[in-house]
Amino acid sequence: MFLSKKEKTVTKSFRISESAFKALEEEARSRNISLNTLANQLLLAYTNWGRFIDRVGPIRTTKSAFNLLLNAASVEAIREAARTSGPDTPKSIILAKHGVLSVNTVLDYIRSATMYGGFAQYSEIESQGKTTITLMHDLGRKGSVFISNVLESIFGMVNIHYELSSSEHSVIIEI
């Protein structure tokens, strides 16, 4: 989400409403970051995720509300919902963003979905020729079931060998 040191920047000016400006200033102060940094983070969130996810009609809800839905459903119903919905939206977003399905574009989707979707924290470590991706979340065991099954359906779209494991608060992918 942050601007890399190597990325070229441009200077532009925009007209925005005074109320939007004041809200942005207040948010930047509360996060202890500059207004410029906040604006860049918001623009990156939109360009890397928002403009694609908005095309498929997202429903914004709190984690606690989503968790209540998960807990009201059986594990098998969660698996089926994840497997059914898993490949459709990611495939649409990956193709809209990259134009091709590949291991790299699938991994970019997972990074973006966690970074901007807010359902998990993403960690990636490369060691001894393997990549280990850990998605940490607070959705409980059924959340891990949902995430794991979505990931399995996404990985099914490309030729990728992976191992997947999960616990109550994490899903681990080894590639």
Please annotate each region the language model reported.
Residues 33-57:
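Short, basic amphipathic alpha-helical segments that act as recognition/interaction helices
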Residues 112-167:
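Short, hydrophobic/π-rich interface segment
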Residues 59-63, 147:
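Intrinsically disordered, low-complexity segments
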Residues 166-175:
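Beta-rich nucleic-acid/ligand-interaction surfaces
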Residues 1-18, 28:
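Short Lys/Arg-rich basic patches
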Residues 63-132:
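An N-terminal amphipathic alpha-helical segment
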